Amino acid sequence: MKFFLMCLIIFPIMGVLGKKNGYPLDRNGKTTECSGVNAIAPHYCNSECTKVYYAESGYCCWGACYCFGLEDDKPIGPMKDITKKYCDVQIIPS
């Protein structure tokens, strides 16, 4: 019984850290665009996602950098479900 009560107290305090995918937002609430030359260079968004937003990887999807493995506390831009499903399939290997 004591073990059960202790678990009820400790687990919520520990929290659950997860990863998410999406278009990360900067301080101004804008996404990193990858149009033109940046869209052609496949490593631009991967570099932005890993070095600026501390994600696992990223690539250009629909004109903005789409990051994989963002921390839960990083804000991401709103998107439609169909866009998320499309961008979640990583086309360009990082």
UniProtKB/Swiss-Prot annotation:
Changing E33A has the effect of: 47.5-fold decrease in toxicity and small effect on the binding affinity to cockroach neuronal membranes
The alphabetical list of record keywords is: Disulfide bond, Ion channel impairing toxin, Neurotoxin, Secreted, Signal, Toxin, Voltage-gated sodium channel impairing toxin
Write out the annotated subcellular location.
Secreted
**Protein name in UniProt:** Beta-insect excitatory toxin Bj-xtrIT
Q: Which CDD domains match?
A: neurotoxins_LC_scorpion
Q: Which cysteines are joined by disulfide bonds?
A: C34-C60, C45-C65, C49-C67, C61-C87
Q: What is the effect of changing E33F?
A: 743-fold decrease in toxicity and small effect on the binding affinity to cockroach neuronal membranes
In the record's own words, the domains note is: Has the structural arrangement of an alpha-helix connected to antiparallel beta-sheets by disulfide bonds (CS-alpha/beta).
PROSITE patterns membership: LCN_CSAB
Q: Name one Pfam family in it.
A: Toxin_3
**Consequence of changing E56I:** Small effect on toxicity and on the binding affinity to cockroach neuronal membranes
**Leader peptide range in chain numbering:** 1-18
Q: Does the keyword Cell cycle apply?
A: no
- Tissue expression pattern: Expressed by the venom gland.
